[in-house]
Regions:
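Structural/interface elements that position substrates and couple domains in central-metabolism enzymes
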Residues: 1-222
Length: 222
């Protein structure tokens, strides 16, 4: 997905002194293979660094907003309408539907790191009560909310089943995966947990079961 994203970028961000602007533009034109001409933004190295982490902080904030609203609707007895509500909000062009989906909190190697980096930098320059800190704290709380929610919903106390444990589908990255975190929390509370993907078995907790369950299971599906 990294290569695909690189070849289909919405924009290209370059930090530096601008002496090699034309060479870099030509290089990215080749990367895009002539199909797309993204907007290219040149700025100082420091400004580019801030832009990169601030962009990801915006996305984590949007993810957290969707999850916060999902919590509100769930606690109001309207969990069946979460998708409809979020799709309605996302239909407003000022908002957009990308990253506006209820589910697990953000994870992986980039979003948590960049969100904390932006929060730390903002505090360093004197902006203490910044969105980065709030978003990171909510993401932690959301993991706890989901654990309590799924345990409550599993009234039959049957084994839980995950399709995958990575932070998103079709990757092998477990870094800060809320799916894997939930799995461990459930195991630590004495629940049986099955996973449909055994490709990362050697990296995961040995208590996880991978054989096809013959009993009824409670599927973790968001």
């Amino acid at each position: 997905s990294i290569i695909t994203d690189l070849q289909n970028a919405d924009m290209v961000l370059i930090g530096g002194d601008g002496n090699h602007k034309s060479e870099l533009e030509k290089m990215y034109e080749k990367i895009q293979m002539g199909f797309i001409s993204p907007s290219i933004y040149f700025m100082s190295t420091k400004a580019a660094e801030v832009t990169k982490i601030a962009l990801n902080c915006f996305l984590t904030t949007k993810i957290s907003y969707a999850n916060m609203l999902g919590q509100v609707l769930t606690m109001s007895g309207m969990e069946d309408e979460i998708d409809n509500v979020l799709n309605s909000i996302g239909a407003d062009k000022r908002v957009g539907k990308k990253y506006l989906k209820y589910g697990f909190g953000f994870g992986g190697p980039c979003f948590p790191r960049d969100n904390r980096a932006f929060a730390s930098y903002a505090s360093k320059v004197g902006v203490d009560h910044n969105i980065g800190h709030v978003t990171d704290a909510f993401n932690e709380d959301h993991a706890t909310f989901l654990k309590e929610y799924f345990i409550f919903k599993n009234k039959k106390k049957i084994p839980f089943f995950f399709n995958y444990l990575t932070y998103k589908p079709n990757t092998d990255i477990l870094t800060e995966s809320q799916q894997y975190r939930l799995c461990l929390d459930l195991l630590n509370e004495g629940h049986l947990v099955y996973c449909g993907d055994s490709s990362l078995k050697d990296q995961c907790d040995s208590r996880i079961l991978y054989e096809k369950p013959t009993e009824q299971v409670f599927e973790i599906n968001l």
